[in-house]
């Protein structure tokens, strides 16, 4: 799925990235917020928490509590997460490109 960065709020040791996508499969239009916190012991990495909301073309609302880890390489943030979503558990692997203002992500159901 392709997401665009809508906004970023920057803090001293954490930043929040707000993203949206026009089409994430059965979830339809999706909005997510990721709050990334730096790990002071490991440079260019940390943990993150977030929340997601999706609305399908049929009007079905999906909600998700998201959490994972991140690493940074240049302008790119690599994220991995295990997410508790309305219809079960998902695994996400993605790359946020700060220069291009977008994220590419793959989302898989955890059985």
Regions found by a protein language model. Name each.
Residues 1-111:
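Beta-strand-enriched cores of mature, soluble protein domains
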